[in-house]
């Protein structure tokens, strides 16, 4: 309980709750945490709360790192990895709703994962990088010419399809004229 009391000391609103309601800070913190967990698990507010916490906690640390004259390499790496993972999870939410609906407690798991991965003190971003991302072969994401080459390939493909469609349209129009 001493550890919980120390954490509760960092949250000013818990002082007001303790004075007005005569509830100890650590119990108020536990109650609020439990209430938030129930809301995440049992209501449609789960995605909103999860995304909000997933943004606010690391955003503050990201701003601190960005304002440093010489940020530590590990700090910058941690935040880059976190925002990349956050983007992937948010994309999963947005585009794979049908799949995610079959994963029990998805937003609860995402909530705790983001609380672990976001703050620098847990080093979640570094752990993810060292154990997963650093092991991805470079050839998977570096190609001759890099991004420029991939964009050129995509542009050429779109151009080919567009030309093909225009040619079909011309053939149809010319066949109508001959009829």
Curated annotation (Swiss-Prot):
State any GO CC term.
membrane
Q: Which spans are transmembrane here?
A: 29-49, 76-96, 97-117
Source domain of life: Eukaryota
Q: Which UniProt keywords apply?
A: Membrane, Transmembrane, Transmembrane helix
Q: Between which residues do disulfide bridges form?
A: none
Looking up InterPro entries in the UniProt record yields: TB2_DP1_HVA22
List localization entries: Membrane
Q: Does the keyword Nucleus apply?
A: no
Membrane topology qualifier? Multi-pass membrane protein
Q: Which family does it belong to?
A: Belongs to the DP1 family.
Q: What is this protein called?
A: Uncharacterized membrane protein ECU09_1950
Source organism of the structure: Encephalitozoon cuniculi (strain GB-M1) (Microsporidian parasite)
Upper lineage is: Eukaryota, Fungi, Fungi incertae sedis, Microsporidia, Unikaryonidae
């Amino acid at each position: 309980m001493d550890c919980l009391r120390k954490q509760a000391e960092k949250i000013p609103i818990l002082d007001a709750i303790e004075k007005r309601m005569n509830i100890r800070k650590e119990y108020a913190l536990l109650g609020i945490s439990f209430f938030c967990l129930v809301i995440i698990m049992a209501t449609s507010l789960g995605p909103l709360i999860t995304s909000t916490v997933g943004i606010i906690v690391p955003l503050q640390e990201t701003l601190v790192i960005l304002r440093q004259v010489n940020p530590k390499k590990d700090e910058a790496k941690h935040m880059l990895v976190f925002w990349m993972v956050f983007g992937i999870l948010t994309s999963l939410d947005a585009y794979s709703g049908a799949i995610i609906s079959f994963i029990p407690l998805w937003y609860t798991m995402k909530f705790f994962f983001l609380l672990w991965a976001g703050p620098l003190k847990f080093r979640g971003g570094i752990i993810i990088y060292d154990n997963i991302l650093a092991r991805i072969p470079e050839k998977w994401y570096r190609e001759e010419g890099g991004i420029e080459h991939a964009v050129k390939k995509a542009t050429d493909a779109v151009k080919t399809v567009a030309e093909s469609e225009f040619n079909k349209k011309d053939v149809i129009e010319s066949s109508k004229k001959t009829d």
